[in-house]
Amino acid sequence: MGEALNGLKRNIMCGDARESHIGQKVTVMGWVQRNRNLGGLQFIDLRDREGILQVVFNDDLGEEILEKAKSIRPEYCIAVTGEIVKRESVNPNMPTGMVELKAEELKILSESDTPPIYIKEDLDAAESIRLKYRYLDLRRPDMQNIFKIRHKTTKAIRDYLDQNGFLEMETPILTKSTPEGARDYLVPSRNYPGMFYALPQSPQLFKQLLMVSGFDRYFQIVKCFRDEDLRANRQPEFTQVDLEMSFVEQDDVMALNECLIKHVFKEVLGVDVKTPIKRMTFKDAMEKYGSDKPDLRFGMEITNLSDVVKECGFKVFTDAVANGGSVRGLCLEGGASMGRKDIDRLGEFVKTFKAKGLAWIQLKEEGVKSPIAKFFSEEELNKIIETMGAKTGDLILIVADKNSVVLKALGELRLELSRKFDLVKDKSEFNFTWITEFDLLEYDEEEGRYFAAHHPFTMPMDEDIKYLDTDPGRVRAKAYDLVLNGEELGGGSIRIHDTKLQEKMFEVLGFTQESAWERFGFLLEAFKFGPPPHGGLAFGLDRMIMFLAGTENIKDVITFPKNQNAFCYLTEAPNIVDEEQLKELGIETIKKEDTAE
């Protein structure tokens, strides 16, 4: 059993001790990083949230305290009182390396078993072990630093929004299921058997209702939930910086959020984000980069070759153009030295994005090398090379198909080439861009209907509203995404605030008037009572912290994350609950039939 504090007070953090404290009597508390005996002296590296301080136990302390110090193992939690003295052998690699604590008193507050993971930076341990013993993983200095950054970030956000007239307000966690997009997490109601709440995928409708309520400017740092397949940058529960503004247009929302981002990056990293942030339409982003979240830290734009090859002798190209598709290419500088096997691998890569193949042209010192060169005249080949802006030593890669396939395949190939050839030269760069004028709707050929590209509450562009009845796929949205280094950092839109227009939007999406009112009647009803024009935006806080902390895995920035299957190794959730609990909720579990042969 550990010793009690008995009124002992810590008066300095381990990592804060400096030369200015020399001669002072202090008490520090923390965890033992290392314990070693050198020449009759006992040295303990003591760690807390702020850093590590060397503690020395001299042989004049007496046998009892020395034996006690020798018995201490890594991760014991201890308290030491003594005097800060100048360190004989300075350690320039530690902020506290000029001083040490000459121990006078020692308390062992609690002991520790041998930890299953090392408490050190750059830990190389299985993710399952790290997540199972997350409380130990979080003791590591690099993990502690991430959550200091997270705290500084949320404080900077709150400070800025408070200074700009925003009210921090909470919205319900138990709400109504309005399935449109990702699956909801459902919560059964005991009071209403057979009925369910849903955990919110976002506070979207409630923040719009707060604008109808007259609060003018709202924000919230809020938990959201989506029951979807997970990737490296997704979790089933995640945090959004959610905000909404009344009496604004698109430029107003974008300008305020640019200033918010500028403030946060300056406060947290000391980095100056250049504003105004450049803008690019959705159409341009897709045409040039094959993505609505382009990484602009390197060039290599997609080039349209359709006009150049539409009458050539290569049937693959001419058929693609004749059938309404396109022929487009990328130019990899210095890529002519790539071997055939590597080029073939790129061909297999684009096939995973439904491309039928990858044509290529190498511009070697001795001339053009390409399996498709025989289908072109010298003049036609030169025209392709000229249009691509290629030179000797380069490699041209071409895809021909319907536009959606060509752009997707080349967009992904562009990123693959960037990874393979390290095309991003400045890894510390923060390259922001706004993507605007998104398509309002996306057509699903399998279901034979339109879906909202963002959500059903997005305002169409004024000049496109007339197409909702005749050509819905042509309608652009007053929507905007903020992209950073090829990742969507946040997104928002101006919202519909008119009952009739909102009903029309639901109609285009395939809702009957009855089903629209059943799901969203509370919003449509609110729009009858003088709603203001309003719009907003939501940032993914977890993703923002990933950028600020320099990590590529969202699990690193969440205290207790789930794995890729939404399972918690620490608590072993989800778990089976008692039959009595299920009975009280009116729920009966049904085993899935084993379909395996």
UniProtKB/Swiss-Prot annotation:
Annotated GO biological process: aspartyl-tRNA aminoacylation
Subcellular location: Cytoplasm
Region (Aspartate): 204-207
The EC number(s) this enzyme carries: 6.1.1.12
One Gene Ontology molecular-function label: nucleic acid binding
Record-linked Pfam families: GAD, tRNA-synt_2, tRNA_anti-codon
Top-level taxon of the source organism: Bacteria
Protein's name in the database: Aspartate--tRNA ligase
UniProt source species: Clostridium perfringens (strain SM101 / Type A)
Gene encoding the protein: aspS
